[in-house]
Amino acid sequence: AGEPDFDTIDYVKEAAIKAINDGQTKYTIVDGTPELKDAIIEKFKRDNGLDYKRENISVNSGGKHTIYNAFMATLNPGDEVIIPAPYWVSYPDMVMLAGGTPVIIEAGIDNNFKIIDR
């Protein structure tokens, strides 16, 4: 269910211990601290040649949470949302909670898990 099958890398452990020792133990800004956004911006620039500003970056607690937030922010009652199958079991419910209508489209192994026009 998404849990890693490897130990946490040492530099991540060390950074977490340092943050605790530095008193960084409170809730942070909901969509990401400036330092985290700057690190994400630098990663996209370095690895992908993409330029973003802080206001273009929003950090969330996971993929499903991000998708749910997007549905809640953008769907109008009755909007159709295409969900490629196979899909995570909660996707249709997330669409319906936001007032949308899920439309399931098969995108299985025969199509290399891509939606194709028939």
Named regions from a protein language model:
Residues M72-R118:
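PLP-dependent aminotransferase-like
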Residues A1-G62, N69:
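N-terminal small-domain helix-loop-helix segment of the aminotransferase-like
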Residues N60-K64, F113-K114:
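A conditional alpha-helix N-cap/helix-loop micro-motif detector
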Residues G63-H65, Y87-W88:
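Short beta->alpha connector loops
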